[in-house]
Amino acid sequence: TGAVTIPATALVTGVLTTTAAAVFNGGFTSNGTAATFASSTSDSPNIIFKNTTNDANAPIMDFITDKGAAGADNDSLGLIRFTGDNDAQEQTTFARVLATVADASNGAEGGRIQLQVATHDGEMQTGLVINDGSAEDEIDVNIGNGTASVTTVAGNLAVVTDLDVDGTTNLDVVDIDGAV
């Protein structure tokens, strides 16, 4: 019982178990390939990043890919998977967030983030892509996957430049020049 201070490196070759909350004052590094947080309690486990500094900055979660060689277009930078049981109690990935390098060219670096969901056969398809554009400070966004995809806008759609429609357009109420 009581506090234990280890003035140097502590080597644990088996499982380290604590019966209370473990507090690390300082950095914590794990050289393992996976860390698992498991709980049989509803709405748990939780991972909390809490910044208690009185300033305008938020906590940061970094996904860093440093492969020891030059980066290349389409390098994967980070993946968040959302997996659960289907009705046969099989573990199925239902959604993913994937970040990749769109352009690795020095001085023209550009990124890409994709939101993906499982479609009717469980196959992962990209529904939203936010991608580096073809000019500085330009971002392109693609919504949907395939010509049968439906994009619904519940409120107003504001187009601040040209509207380019490739296909059939059905307009129920048209007021372009002030007349209906």
Predicted regions mapped to residue ranges:
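Intrinsic low-complexity, repeat-rich intrinsically disordered segments enriched
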Residues: T1-D73, A88, V101-A102, G107, ...
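Short, hydrophobic/aromatic-rich segments at coil-to-beta transitions
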Residues: D73-R81
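Amphipathic hydrophobic-ligand
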Residues: Q89-R96
